[in-house]
Design a protein with these regions (language model features):
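Conserved tyrosine-mediated DNA breakage-rejoining catalytic core shared by Y-recombinases
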Residues: 11, 20-57
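C-terminal catalytic core of Y-nucleophile DNA break-rejoin enzymes
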Residues: 40-83
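Short basic/aromatic active-site micro-motif
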Residues: 1-2, 74-75, 91-111
Length: 158
């Protein structure tokens, strides 16, 4: 289950898409991996490039059966995550969707275009992606408010 969650953190895939991902969906181009898969929620075919972390995770898995995460127990994954977080002393509520959320917020935090993020997240409506952008704007606003004020006597005139 940990692998499924980390893979979603690295790809932004929904639980249903990670759970149904098959090895035949994993393709190679110029030694890099990407996914060609059928998205469960939107009933559309998608192509998704993979970051190095997602590639490394896939390459570390043993192929047994057609499903990529065949040995992962997808039932009760949120209960597993709760125990995992408790062991790590993480107090924040975490669900499988947190992985997808983290992927989106990380991209926006690193100033990836909101339109690119929309495509990677397979959001049909940009307004859905804008919800995540608002979160990063609030984070940025809180960050700059933490900066100290300059004392009027510390500022030298040029």
């Amino acid at each position: 289950m940990k692998n499924m969650f980390l893979f979603s953190c690295s790809t932004g895939l929904r639980f249903s898409d990670v759970a149904n991902l098959q090895w035949k969906n994993v393709k190679t181009h110029n030694k890099h991996l990407f996914l060609e898969y059928h998205q469960q929620k939107t009933n559309t075919n998608e192509v998704l490039p993979l970051c190095a972390q997602a590639e490394n995770l896939l390459r570390s898995l043993k192929r047994s059966g057609s499903k990529v995460f065949a040995n992962e127990f997808s039932q009760n994954i949120n209960k597993f995550l709760k125990r995992w977080c408790k062991a790590a002393k993480i107090r924040k509520r975490v669900s499988f969707h947190t992985a997808r959320h983290s992927f989106c917020v990380m991209l926006l935090t690193y100033d990836v275009s909101i339109y690119t993020v929309q495509q990677l997240m397979c959001h049909s409506d940009i307004d859905t992606t804008k919800i995540y952008a608002d979160i990063t704007n609030k984070t940025k606003n809180r960050a700059v408010k933490k900066l100290p004020l300059f004392d009027k006597f510390d500022v030298k005139r040029a």
